[in-house]
């Protein structure tokens, strides 16, 4: 899985695992008497913030997104997630069934997570251009600031941000909103494919 390229291991916490090499070495130096050596378990210390576009044109990609989410939960000890619809505005949510009732202000999300989080947006980037560029462009909420401003806040706050697009790359140039988002992301939009994921993880791990 391409996510494994985004690894930075650290030994943290109380959980321990067998240090096989040290156990063999210590046992040999102990006259053959078993001398078990333990070491703190290695954890992937990379911090990841996943933001998924849900609903509408993203429905055909639900299974792909679920697989990505499951893989990320296994791979990263520090993984947080939020949902948005079409584009990021001033509110995000974690329970899509309560998207109108339990919305977290995006500004609070930005305050909650440090610059060292690797941010991964997942969405098809297909929408009316005014949904990105205009106040009130959201089809779900009344957004006072254009979505483009909010995406800029993410790219300025976090050290590394990428956008994974499940739509085949050959179609991107035909969608104006996709081209706008590519520009806002400084071309750090990648296909949600093995090759695209490898490219995205290589960038995030620099």
Model-derived regions, located:
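A short, conserved beta-to-alpha structural element at the edge of catalytic cores
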Residues: 73-95, 149-169
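Short, non-transmembrane amphipathic alpha-helical segments
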Residues: 65-71
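Short hydrophobic beta-strand that contains or immediately precedes a catalytic carboxylate
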Residues: 47-53
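Generic recognition of flexible, low-complexity loop/linker segments
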Residues: 36-39, 105-110, 149-152
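Acidic/polar low-complexity segments with low predicted structural confidence
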Residues: 1-46
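Von Willebrand factor type A / integrin I
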Residues: 113-115, 125, 129-206
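Von Willebrand factor
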Residues: 80-120, 126-129
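Short acidic, Gly/Ser-rich segments with clustered Asp/Glu that frequently serve as metal-coordination loops
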Residues: 54-63
């Amino acid at each position: 899985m391409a996510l494994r390229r985004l690894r930075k291991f650290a030994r943290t916490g109380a959980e321990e695992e067998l240090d096989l090499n040290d156990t063999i070495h210590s046992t040999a130096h102990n006259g053959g008497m078993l001398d078990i050596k333990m070491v703190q378990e290695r954890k992937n210390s990379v911090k990841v913030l996943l933001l998924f576009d849900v609903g509408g044109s993203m429905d055909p990609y639900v299974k792909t997104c679920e697989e990505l989410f499951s893989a990320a939960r296994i791979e990263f000890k520090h993984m947080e997630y939020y949902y948005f619809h079409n584009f990021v505005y001033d509110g995000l949510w974690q329970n899509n069934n309560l998207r109108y009732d339990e919305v977290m202000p995006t500004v609070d999300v930005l305050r909650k997570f440090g610059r060292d989080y690797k941010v991964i947006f997942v969405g098809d980037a297909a929408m009316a251009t005014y949904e990105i560029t205009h106040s009130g462009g959201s089809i779900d909420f009344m957004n006072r600031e254009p979505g483009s401003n909010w995406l800029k806040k993410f790219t300025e706050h976090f050290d590394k941000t990428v956008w994974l697009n499940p739509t085949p790359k050959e179609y991107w140039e035909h969608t104006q909103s996709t081209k706008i988002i590519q520009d806002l992301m400084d071309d750090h939009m990648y296909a949600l494919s093995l090759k695209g994921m490898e490219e995205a993880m290589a960038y995030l791990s620099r």
